[in-house]
């Protein structure tokens, strides 16, 4: 293609342990790998390249692995097997990802931009533009936990596009909200495309994917079923959906059950992860990392809100502090 590769997945697989309860999860920390609980392969041997300036769509039925790919691509979770190469800074736009419920919209903006390494002067300069783009009115000064899903998506999108990422990953963020905001987002996406940015667009809407994307990757129960031009793959996927919807309910249930059972089967071929040592943590490492992340988020919250630790406790209560420092977007049970 003659363009630099921005994202490369090489034989990537992602395994999750299927715990029945919290006690099983704790036991899993101490059990050797040979005695692990039953697992589920969300991805199996996935390989693709995305080039500089491309807009690539990820489509597939629920549970096909689309969001797992976007999370790995954004650095939220690591792969279990294979190699992932990202050349540039990635920003993930998904409903409520990275937004802290107890904080106001204004405070979330400051916190997110601080975590992107921006200085206070840069944040103050961007703040009016972000608030205007989000267009949520007086709710900007209300806690995120009181927002609708559409308002969360608006704010998340507004923040992410103002961080000027090299690679923009949009995971179902345009599935909520009104037509006016959707058109505003599409205009911003087209602006990014004109600037040569790389965009990965995850959606169930074939119309959106066909109009915005150059290529499509069709994920099906953790594997790539088709990959090619937007028109070709969208047509094949549309034909599959229409065929599947015509089948009797008993057949649909059997079809889905068989494929999900296959995803529980052991991986037939093992592809080593060149960064395995980087991802493999001891129990002490996991505890230390959890505390470190919690303190980092707490410190960022204090800076974003301009409050002291004592003031935050008295105003929000100890329960709210626990919510602020709760790390819900990290998979510390690394395989």
From Swiss-Prot:
User: Could you tell me where this protein is found in the cell?
Assistant: Cell membrane
Q: Which GO terms describe its molecular function?
A: ABC-type teichoic acid transporter activity; ATP binding; ATP hydrolysis activity
Query: Which reaction(s) does the protein catalyse, per the Swiss-Prot or TrEMBL entry?
Result: ATP + H2O + teichoic acidSide 1 = ADP + phosphate + teichoic acidSide 2
Its main localization is membrane
Write down the Pfam families for this protein, in alphabetical order: ABC_tran
Subunit structure as annotated in this protein's UniProt entry: The complex is composed of two ATP-binding proteins (TagH) and two transmembrane proteins (TagG).
Q: What is this protein called?
A: Teichoic acids export ATP-binding protein TagH
Q: Which organism is it from?
A: Listeria monocytogenes serotype 4b (strain F2365)
């Amino acid at each position: 293609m003659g363009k630099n590769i921005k994202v490369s997945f090489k034989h990537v697989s992602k395994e999750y342990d299927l715990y029945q309860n919290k006690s099983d999860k704790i036991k899993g920390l101490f059990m050797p790998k040979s005695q692990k609980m039953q697992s589920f392969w969300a991805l199996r041997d996935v390989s693709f390249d995305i080039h500089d300036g491309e807009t690539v769509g990820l489509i597939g039925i629920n549970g096909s692995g689309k969001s797992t790919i976007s999370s790995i691509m954004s650095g939220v979770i690591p792969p279990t097997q294979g190699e992932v190469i990202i050349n540039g800074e990635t920003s993930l736009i998904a409903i409520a990802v990275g937004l802290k419920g107890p904080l106001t919209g204004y405070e979330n903006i400051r916190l997110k931009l601080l975590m992107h390494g921006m200085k206070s002067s840069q944040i103050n300069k961007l703040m009016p533009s972000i608030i205007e783009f989000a267009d949520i009115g007086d709710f900007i000064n209300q806690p995120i936990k009181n927002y609708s899903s559409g308002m969360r998506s608006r704010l998340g999108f507004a923040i992410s596009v103002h961080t000027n990422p090299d690679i923009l990953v949009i995971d179902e963020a345009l599935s909520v909200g009104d037509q006016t905001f959707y058109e505003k987002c599409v205009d911003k996406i087209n602006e990014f495309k004109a600037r040569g940015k790389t965009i990965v667009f995850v959606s169930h809407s074939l119309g959106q994917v066909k109009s915005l994307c150059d290529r499509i990757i069709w994920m099906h129960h953790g594997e790539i079923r088709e990959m090619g031009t937007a028109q070709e793959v969208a047509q094949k996927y549309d034909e599959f959906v229409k065929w599947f919807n015509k089948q009797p309910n008993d057949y649909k249930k059997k079809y889905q059950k068989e494929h999900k059972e296959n995803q529980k089967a052991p991986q037939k071929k093992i592809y080593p992860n060149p960064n395995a040592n980087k991802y493999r943590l001891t129990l002490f490492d996991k505890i230390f990392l959890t505390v470190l992340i919690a303190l980092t988020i707490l410190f960022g919250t204090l800076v974003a809100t301009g409050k002291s630790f004592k003031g935050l406790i008295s105003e929000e209560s100890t329960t709210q502090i626990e919510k602020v420092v709760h790390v819900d977007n990290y998979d510390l049970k690394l395989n």
